[in-house]
């Protein structure tokens, strides 16, 4: 899917100065942020204020790739009004199930490394086949 856009969950925490200005002069800051999103190749799908929890704003934004999402993150953080921000790739349930299937096919048995100076850990032996006798 070369032209598909990836969805990202964006969580934003304003700093105290930004909140002070928003309380004194309420405004929709997304009017200022939308052009930044667009210059990074994205478009806002949904945005909401969050009044409980660690973040103040949650948004779903589509970007062409992770580099565009990273550029958006850097641009916003450089602006000075945000003290913390998370940008996380979202996947649909269907995509997640495909990934789970891939992980199941690729899994291996993990055994921790041996401490220095000790004998290497023994790998689990495959069970003997039924009907085969040991001598």
What are these regions (language model features)?
Residues 1-39, 43-45, 49-54, 93-135:
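Short S/T/G/P-rich N-terminal loop/turn motif that feeds into the first structured element of a domain
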Residues 19, 60, 68, 77-78, ...:
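Short linear sequence elements within intrinsically disordered, low-complexity coil regions
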Residues 13, 58-62:
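Short hydrophobic/aromatic beta-strand micro-patches
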Residues 62-95:
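An amphipathic, aromatic/His-enriched active-site/gating alpha helix that lines ligand/cofactor pockets
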């Amino acid at each position: 899917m070369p032209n598909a856009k990836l969805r990202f969950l964006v969580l934003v925490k304003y700093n105290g100065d930004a909140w002070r200005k928003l309380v004194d002069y309420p405004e929709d800051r997304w009017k200022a942020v939308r052009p930044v999103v667009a210059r990074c190749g994205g478009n806002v799908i949904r945005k909401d204020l969050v009044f409980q929890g660690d973040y103040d704003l949650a948004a779903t934004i589509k970007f062409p790739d992770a580099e565009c999402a990273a550029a958006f993150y850097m641009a916003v953080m450089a602006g000075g009004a945000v003290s913390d921000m998370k940008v996380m790739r979202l996947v649909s349930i269907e995509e997640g199930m495909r990934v789970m299937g891939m992980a199941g096919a690729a899994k291996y048995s993990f055994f921790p490394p041996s401490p220095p100076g000790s004998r290497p850990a023994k790998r689990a032996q495959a069970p003997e086949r039924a009907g085969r006798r040991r001598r």
